[in-house]
A protein has these predicted regions:
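N-terminal periplasmic accessory domains that precede
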Residues: 84-87, 104-107, 119, 134-135, ...
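N-terminal periplasmic "start-of-domain" segments of outer-membrane beta-barrel proteins
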Residues: 44-77, 105, 113, 123
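Transmembrane beta-barrel wall of Gram-negative outer-membrane proteins
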Residues: 192-295, 314, 318-340, 563-565, ...
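Gram-negative outer-membrane beta-barrel transporters
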Residues: 641-643, 654-655, 660-759, 805
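Extracytoplasmic beta-strand/coil segments of soluble accessory domains associated
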Residues: 85-124
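C-terminal beta-signal and adjacent terminal beta-strands/loops
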Residues: 645, 704, 756-760, 781-833
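Short acidic/polar hinge/loop motifs at secondary-structure boundaries
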Residues: 123-151, 202
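Outer-membrane beta-barrel signature, preferentially recognizing the C-terminal barrel domain
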Residues: 309-328, 498-511, 556, 585-644, ...
Length: 833
């Protein structure tokens, strides 16, 4: 059992007492239902898609019982977004982390990825990558009707949502009567490498008096070149640059995401108010070709330029694939039981993550070279010999592999009823949830193979020079990497293998219950309650002691009480004040929690997982002042704070060797893996403006609008040695700004995104990504005619207009990675019927 501090405990007791009072007061049944408890329905934007969808988002935020930001369907459709990460990155305090230029993860208010929980139609799902981290590149925008980014967490939300809880709303078949259909078809180009971009989506629905269904599918694909340079640099005593290594890479990638799903629903007016079955499948696949040459200087010298330097040369070739998927099926109902509305559901979810990157490393050759790093993002390296003429005496196979399969069964029961509490109309909500998760896989690993002489790699050199934003002074050329992989497979030596000590096997059961009451006052409302979560987990694996395998297990049971309170006060009809106090937890991911380790008694080291890790615990506050000065308009300021204990990160720690081998009890060994730090926190302020010129300027200038937001954040935690570091994902400043014009069926928007530098990954807290910015443009025109009652529009999107280069920096302040991707353009047509 986890015991809370006295302050936390007193707050928990007081809130649970109030929730108990609410349950007792349930006998004082009130008649009718307050409209403030109604679910906000999707608003379908047509004539003014940007303005109308902005108004829907503002109204959803205004009527919420907690701090939340919303993106409506048409906002997603009109933004030039590839996936949900792009969409969420436009909200206040949310920042995108990219992979090869494309949005993948979300840092919610500067917090690590794991502090954000994702749900589909209110049913939370595990992260595909490691059981915790949500990846948003596998969820295309086209299947989504609404995004809800909850910033202050309520008891009916998972306790793991330390920073935020993102709910993806899919489409409701009863939002429109009869048959409907929506189609989107787009084609485009990636400027660097002239890669093709394609997208399509199709959605259809039908609803009658009792029955309805919706079905949808979506597919997006893009071919891209990533122009990459990596560095190993340091500085001498006088501050001059020393070049140890230069790494030139060109990636050819094809990324595709596919989704399909639907919902079958019945609506009644007796005991069964609603019964439904929903299903969703989404996947992301990244096909990657690597062409890489590494130049290691034999005797590094000081200076940004030098001549006739001896270098060893290595070549890396690869054709591999990353893929992750989520499939979820839910059967649920809304039932009336007296004064109660009871909502049971059962959900089956499976997530898969697989990586297989077979790399061929050729080494053992060298030459001399001149270099000039005057432009650090475009290093110039001139070789004395033609790169393609170099011969490599040895070739090694490095098949990198990683996998995780996670199956979850979830039982959920929610119940609510109207009551009178403190003489005021209130809504009492109670709930139970049981999650049974089974995760199996292995961590990222490889086994080196000597493949010298098995095949001639030079015959696969196409002679085609790299597509590059930089100057490619080495004369890099593309290899037929697919042919190389076929040749490797033909030798019978390409295997997807891993050691027993790399395995992940975790069984996790989480049992939760909550009680919550929302009381309506003349001045606003008060929502309060608590959630209790009990975690039972067991991790199995093998301990390798100098080559001898022993089966090991780790298990524990712990309980957390997570109270929260939310006050929403209407100072005026157009002015709202909010303040919330919340608590939460973040459990270790499955790689961190695995029991498997490698032990070397001779070296006194242990490497691997840590099943004794504690869950991270949080307590914090949110407050905001929101001025709704016109329809679809908002000016707000907010602040937030989270205290985090038991921060999980990678480090080396002294341990008693008897923990791993009783014969060595009392001897001190070094454990290298995952440990708990302390004294973590993140805090910040947010500002948000959304407005239009509709009431300020005459036609046609009344079509202009502006949205802008900014967040200023800081964070830190203390490691086991007493040093302080930023939490991964924290940018000191995040900005977003959009200017749009919308009149006469024409819509256009320019969007700017910026985030300051941030730590990533947590395995090296000294390494940071440099500041990043993006400028995107979108426009659409609604066609003024219709053949059969449909509404059609044509659109054009342009992304990364300023052709940005993204940089990463080592702990010594020198650059260690620079990559660019070029602009992209997409044109298409949307038809709604």
């Amino acid at each position: 059992m986890k015991y809370l501090s006295p302050n936390k405990l007193s707050l928990a007791i007081s809130l649970l007492t109030l929730a108990g009072s609410a349950a007792y007061a349930s006998a004082e049944d009130t008649t009718g239902s307050d409209d403030s408890h109604a679910v906000i329905e999707e608003v379908v934007a047509t004539a003014s898609p940007i303005r109308d969808s902005q108004e829907a988002a503002v109204e959803a935020k205004r009527n919420a019982d907690n701090t939340v930001d919303v993106i409506s369907a048409d906002t997603i459709g009109r933004f030039p977004d590839q996936n949900l990460a792009d969409s969420l990155g436009r909200l206040p305090g949310l920042a995108i982390e990219r992979d090869q230029g494309q949005a993948r993860y979300i840092n919610f208010r500067g917090a690590p990825f794991r502090y954000t929980k994702i749900a589909i139609d209110g049913i939370d799902v595990p992260g595909a990558e490691n059981g915790r981290t949500p990846r948003f590149d596998s969820f295309p925008s086209a299947i989504t009707s609404k995004l809800e980014a909850n910033k202050a967490i309520m008891p009916n939300m998972p306790g793991e949502a330390v920073a935020g809880y993102i709910n993806i709303r899919t489409f409701d078949p009863f939002s429109r009567e009869g048959w409907t259909a929506a189609a989107d078809l787009g084609k485009g180009k990636q400027e660097l490498g002239d890669g093709d971009i394609s997208k399509y989506s199709l959605r259809t629905s039908w609803s009658g008096e009792r029955f309805g269904f919706v079905a949808f599918t979506s597919h997006n694909e893009r071919e891209q070149i990533t122009d990459n340079r990596e560095y190993d640099l340091e500085k001498d005593a006088s501050g001059d640059l020393i070049v140890n290594k230069l790494d030139f890479r060109s990636y050819k990638i094809t990324r595709e995401d596919t989704a399909w799903g639907g919902r079958l629903e019945y609506r009644g007016d007796d005991i069964v108010q609603r019964a439904y079955f929903s299903t969703l499948y989404s996947e992301f696949i990244d096909h990657e070709e690597r062409n890489q040459f590494v130049f290691d200087f034999t005797a590094p010298v000081s200076g940004t330029s030098a001549e006739d330097q001896a270098v060893s040369v290595s070549r890396y070739l690869e054709y591999g694939k990353y893929e992750n998927s989520t499939r979820t099926h839910t059967l649920g109902a809304d039932l009336v039981a007296g004064a109660w509305l009871v909502t049971p559901s059962v959900t089956l979810t499976r997530t898969d993550y697989n990586m297989f990157i077979p790399i061929l490393l050729s080494a053992g050759t060298g030459t001399t070279a001149d270099y000039d790093l005057g432009d650090i993002e475009d290093p110039e390296l001139y070789l004395a010999d033609d790169l393609s003429s170099l011969t490599y005496p040895v070739t090694y196979g490095l098949p990198y592999t990683q996998a995780l399969e996670n199956e979850e069964t979830k039982f959920k029961l929610d119940a609510q009823r109207d009551i009178s509490l403190f003489g005021q109309p209130s809504l009492l909500s109670l709930g139970l949830q049981y999650d049974n998760r089974n995760a199996d896989g292995h961590v990222a690993t490889y086994a080196m193979q000597n493949l010298t002489g098995l095949f001639d790699l030079d015959r696969y050199n196409t002679g085609e020079r790299w597509d590059s934003n930089t100057t490619n002074t080495i004369g890099g050329t593309y290899y037929d990497n697919k042919g190389v992989r076929d040749a490797w497979e033909a030798t019978g030596t390409l295997h997807n293998s891993y050691a027993e000590t790399d395995k992940i096997s975790v069984d996790e059961k989480v049992t939760a219950a909550y009680a919550m009451a929302t009381t309506e006052m003349a001045w606003g409302n008060l929502s309060f309650g608590a959630r209790i979560e009990q975690t039972d987990y067991r991790s199995e694996g093998y301990m390798d002691v100098d080559g001898s395998l022993q089966k090991v297990t780790g298990e524990d049971t712990f309980t957390h009480v997570l109270p929260s309170v939310h006050l929403n006060a209407d100072i005026r009809d157009d002015l709202k004040f909010r303040i919330s106090a919340t608590t939460g937890i973040s459990r270790p991911n499955y790689e961190e929690w695995r029991a498997a380790v490698v032990v070397s008694p001779t070296e006194g080291t242990v490497t691997g997982g840590n099943p004794d890790l504690k869950a991270e615990e949080s307590m914090g506050m949110d407050t905001s002042l929101e001025w709704y000065f016109a329809p679809g308009s908002l000016l707000s300021a907010g602040a937030f704070y989270r205290a985090i204990d038991n921060v999980i990160y990678a480090d080396g720690q002294s341990v008693d060797a008897g923990r791993y081998d009783p014969a060595y009890a009392g001897v001190e060994w070094t454990y290298n893996g995952y440990v708990n730090g302390s004294d973590g926190m993140f805090q910040g302020v947010e500002f948000n403006f959304m407005g239009t010129a509709a009431d300020l300027l005459p036609s046609p200038f009344d079509g202009f609008g502006l949205s802008a937001n900014a967040a200023f954040i800081n964070s830190h935690f203390k490691d086991i040695h007493g040093a302080h570091h930023d939490l991964p994902g924290t940018s000191d400043s995040i900005y977003n700004a959009s200017v749009f014009y919308e009149r006469y069926g024409f819509s256009a928007r320019v969007n700017y995104m910026y985030r300051d530098q941030w730590v990533s990954p947590i395995e090296d807290p000294s390494e940071v990504w440099g500041e990043q910015k993006r400028v995107d443009f979108s426009m659409s025109y609604e066609l003024p005619y219709s053949a059969a009652g449909e509404t059609s529009s044509v659109y054009f999107n342009a992304n990364n207009l300023t052709n940005e280069t993204d940089n990463r920096y080592a702990g010594n302040g020198t650059i260690n990675q620079s990559e660019s991707y070029g602009r992209s353009y997409l044109a298409g047509i949307r038809v709604n019927y």
